[in-house]
A protein has these predicted regions:
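Alpha/beta-hydrolase-fold catalytic nucleophile elbow
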Residues: 170
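Conserved Radical SAM active-site core
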Residues: 8-10, 17-163, 173-198
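Conserved small/polar residues in nucleotide/adenosyl-binding loops
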Residues: 200-205
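Conserved PDZ fold ligand-binding element
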Residues: 1
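A generic structural motif
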Residues: 4-6
Length: 206
């Protein structure tokens, strides 16, 4: 291990341990150059709906692939640079947890208010081809990514099984703190039942 002191002097440290032993080190933070944050403006973002006055860490919209690998945080891949993909593939950072929401490009762009969000599947395919396994999540919103869009998303992800290991479908959550945000409603009971039926009757992933 290479460490650097406060005077920028580097030295090497060798740690000897058995395979099943902990490293015996604790770090002040998971990353040392700051957490990469989300610059999307999703119509369903729960952070935007949070009440004020809570602890500061709850308002951090992290979108950092390193935290995805370490802690299972979901990322969107919209802020990924070429060197980020190269680092993931080189060090085999697997699995990763990806917020998909929709595989139809125009729908994902609309939901995330990001014109680059539609490039998702090419990025997922690149990771899968490099042997990176993926867990996916869909925040399902009425009139956006339900119905045929959800069915297409399921088919697209199912086609990448077993490297795409899971697909979690989460109904949108709404609080009363939505002033000046995109209008959004909850699913009705019949609509929710239709989604469950769609997913339940779809072929199981390989």
């Amino acid at each position: 291990m290479t460490i650097e002191d406060s005077e920028c002097r580097q030295r090497q440290i060798v740690i000897e341990k058995y395979t099943d032993e902990e490293l015996g080190l604790e770090f002040e933070a998971a990353v040392f150059d700051g957490v990469t944050t989300c610059y999307n403006n999703c119509v369903f973002c729960f952070v935007d709906q949070m009440i004020p006055g809570m602890r500061e860490s709850l308002y951090v919209r992290d979108d950092d692939y390193r935290l995805s690998f370490l802690y299972g945080n979901f990322i969107t891949l919209t802020n990924m640079k070429e060197e980020d993909f190269e680092q993931i593939i080189k060090t085999h950072m697997s699995p990763l947890y990806i917020s998909v929401h929709a595989t139809r490009p125009e729908v994902r762009c609309q939901m995330m208010n990001n014109r680059f969000a539609g490039e998702l599947m090419s990025k997922i395919n690149r990771l899968v081809e490099a042997g990176i396994s993926i867990h996916t999540q869909i925040v399902c919103c009425p009139g956006y990514n339900d119905g045929e869009v959800l069915e297409q998303t399921y088919r697209d992800l199912e086609a990448l099984a077993p490297m795409v290991e899971t697909m979690a479908v989460v109904p949108v959550g709404i609080t009363k703190h939505r002033e000046h945000l995109t209008p959004m409603r909850l699913f009705s009971k019949p609509e929710a039942a239709a989604i469950v039926c769609l997913l339940y009757t779809s072929p199981s992933p390989r």
